[in-house]
Amino acid sequence: MATLDRRALLAVAPALLLAACEPKMPQTASTTPKIDLEGLDTAIKALAVVAQPGFLGVGLMNLESGESYLFNGERRFPMQSVFKLPLAAAVLGEIDAGKILSSERVFLIEQQLAPQHSPIAAAWPGRREYSVGELLEAVVVDSDNTAADVLMKRIGGPGALTAWLTAKYLTGIRVDRYERELQPQIHGMASFRPGWRDPAAYAAAREKVPAATRAAAMTAYMADPRDTASPRGMLEFLQKLDRRDLLSVTSTRLLLEMMGRTTRGAARLQAGLPSDARLAHRPGAADFAQGRSPAHNDVGIFTLANRRAYAIAVFLSGATLDDAGPDAIIARVARAAVRAIG
């Protein structure tokens, strides 16, 4: 693993010591205009009302100056597939350290398959062998759950990933479970079994769980501190990624390039940005169930046409809006951010 850079930590820390919804002075001199923090706060608070009884969390940071905005910045939100971003970073960190080769071959057995979304599970047993590089691409670009679980195991499991984050002074993110554990638990289901790799079979098994059991499991999931991140924690991660504090230049470039190629979550942050903006992101969401959207998120780095770059993190948990509603709120957060940037 890469060694810790305490000087970088001391330089970054002041930019992250801010209260939710409070203005903050830029960390360094900047040629970019200040964020309209008051206007942004007004817009985000209005969207938080729309999201009720769900909770909205927002983080925005000017990556040149460090000027930041947070709403519910310390609140823990379930990540869903957003966790695949720090997972990919940790895998690339192992590649940088020479502990894993991107060309290393992995042969999948049935017990490694994970619930949807997983084109790799759907392709099994027709295809069983992948390189680490191919699995990494499947995780970041296509959000493949089987690929995520296999790579998680390869680096030592969820505990090892959280330890890697902690070693980088990133304590606002924690990963605790494999997808094959987490996803069934959300719905009060038994442990995942290979026969559920078919989406229809998985949905049928989920519907067999009593409604009261599913509702209780969903409520417990939204209150569970495991597998969560705070908006502040995610901004810290994105800032360190942008500053090359986590990975080599080559690995950082590769990760951002893969994040830029995902087509998932296109109705969220991407929908709220100008057409000429570039976005490298990792969305994540749980299925709308029991009348609630337990997790609907999108985090990333966007670069405007004038080359100003910003980190943004939007989390939404517990909204009772229909399937399109949470997407629309995240897109509106992105629009509000662009207006505030000026």
Task: Give names to the regions the model predicted.
Residues A2-L10, E22-I44, P158, T219, ...:
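Structured C-terminal helix/loop/strand segments within mature extracytoplasmic catalytic/sensor domains
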Residues A11-A15:
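Sec-dependent N-terminal signal peptides
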Residues P26-M189:
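Active-site-adjacent loops and short helices of periplasmic peptidoglycan-processing enzymes
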Residues E67, A122-P125, A216-M218, V314-L316:
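A short small-residue
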Residues P119, A167-K168, E179-R180, R193-P194, ...:
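Short alpha-helix boundary/capping motifs
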Residues D144-K153, R174-E179, P194-A211, R292-L304, ...:
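Short, highly charged low-complexity linear segments
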Residues G172-S248:
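Active-site-proximal helix/loop microenvironment
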